[in-house]
Amino acid sequence: MASPNKPGYAVFFIQVNNPDAYTEYASLVLPSLKPYQGRVISAVSRNDMRQIEGVPSSDRAAIIEFPSLDIAEEWYKSSTYTHATAIRNKAGVSQVVLMRGR
């Protein structure tokens, strides 16, 4: 179990293929964060990213901070965000990582 006094992060990389679905997804994320005390640290398009290594595969990226890794996972598995995930999957291809901060 993650230490509750260390923040947790959700990191997203998304290649958008359906902009309308992505817009719908984005409108659902912020309201889903509030009950979990989540806050968006950064949400950017490719123009605001610098690819240092590897092959660019995403045109959107986001980092969301939570009070702990456990709370980040609770949010990710919540019914509200699960609904948003289904729409995100229609929007394109994504990679999501949950990680503990220091």
Regions found by a protein language model. Name each.
Residues 1-77, 100-102:
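Short S/T/G/P-rich N-terminal loop/turn motif that feeds into the first structured element of a domain
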Residues 89-102:
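C-terminal end-helix/capping segment
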Residues 39-41, 83-85, 95-96:
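A short linear hydrophobic-aromatic micro-motif
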Residues 73-90:
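C-terminal structural segments of small proteins and small subunits
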